[in-house]
Regions:
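Lipid-exposed faces of alpha-helical membrane segments in multi-pass integral membrane proteins
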Residues: 2-10, 62, 66, 71, ...
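C-terminal transmembrane helix and the adjacent membrane-cytosol boundary/short C-terminal tail
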Residues: 127, 173-183, 222-257
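Generic hydrophobic transmembrane alpha-helix motif, especially the helices
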Residues: 35, 39, 45, 67-72, ...
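Transmembrane alpha-helices
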Residues: 54-67, 100, 160-192, 239
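Transmembrane alpha-helix signature in integral membrane proteins
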Residues: 45-78
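N-terminal signal-anchor/first transmembrane alpha helix
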Residues: 1-16, 20, 93
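Glycine-rich helix-loop "coupling/hinge" segments at transmembrane-helix boundaries
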Residues: 109-112, 124, 139-140, 182, ...
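Amphipathic cytosolic juxtamembrane alpha-helices at the membrane-cytosol interface
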Residues: 43-58, 83-91, 141-145, 149-177
Length: 257
């Protein structure tokens, strides 16, 4: 995960060519001048993969951290804290969204809004908000009856104060773990939508777009598609391993084991 972040952050320093600059040569195999070869338009594959890391991280951060996490967490905390009709209403909404396959729902949303990176991020954020809502609800139900929270209610503390000062800090750990795991899936969904032509649009470099266009040249120039595929695999694996590590570190039950 750290490797992907560092490559994305230093893309301007470590790429020899502009990712959209077209060289006269086409489908040149990897060599000392072009480390990962050139694509069908004469663009440097290495430079496009490094800049594509920026697109993937940007899509993941916006869709998960800025959309899914806050909206889902608010829904879950409200449902778990107030219960009653609020819990019933929000839980049914979450159940309805869980009834649809994640990728199919994302494709439907982008199909309605139109193909673009922005709409892709909105779609990913919408389909992952229920996951955070369910985790936040379960965690809130577990802490809302603790003695110090009951005591806060008894002395007249408002619901907003209790949620901000007592509930949210106690449910942060599972939400942080889920955020890391969701980032890996968000990168994969963004790549899938771009592969289908619904996500990032040319000439912006995207791993999914590179994989989609490169598949037509698998026999003639396999490097055009293989290297973006490897980049996706490394990024997804890295975030999954980071999520597993955070879970081991933050989950008290696993620490005791």
């Amino acid at each position: 995960m750290l490797l992907v972040v560092l490559l994305a952050a230093s893309a301007d320093l470590i790429t020899p060519y502009d990712p959209v600059w077209q060289i006269d040569e086409r489908l040149t195999p990897p060599n000392w001048d072009y480390l990962l070869g050139l694509d069908e338009f004469g663009r440097d594959v290495y430079s496009r993969i490094i800049y594509g890391a920026r697109v993937s991280l940007y899509a993941g951060i916006v869709s998960v951290i800025l959309i899914a996490l806050p909206f889902g967490s608010v829904m879950g905390v409200l449902a778990g804290y107030f219960r009653g009709w609020v819990d019933t209403l929000l839980s049914r909404l979450v159940d309805i969204m869980f009834a649809f396959p994640t990728l199919l729902l994302a494709i439907t949303i982008v199909g309605v809004l139109g193909p673009s990176l922005t709409n892709t991020m909105v779609a990913i954020g919408i389909v992952y908000a229920p996951t955070f809502a369910r985790i936040a609800r379960g965690s809130t139900l577990g802490v809302s009856n603790l003695d110090y929270i009951v005591a806060s209610r008894t002395v007249g503390a408002g619901s907003a104060r209790i949620i901000v000062r007592h509930v949210l800090p106690n449910i942060a750990a599972p939400l942080i773990i889920q955020t890391t795991l969701a980032l890996s899936t968000a990168i994969l969904i963004e790549a899938t939508l771009s592969f289908l032509g619904l996500g990032t649009q040319p000439p912006m470099p995207s791993w999914g777009t590179m994989l989609g266009t490169g598949r037509r040249y698998m026999e003639l120039a396999p490097w055009v598609a293989v290297y973006p595929g490897i980049a996706i695999m490394i990024a997804v694996l890295g975030f999954n391993l980071a999520g597993d590590g955070l879970r081991d570190a933050l989950d008290p039950r696993l620490r005791e084991a």
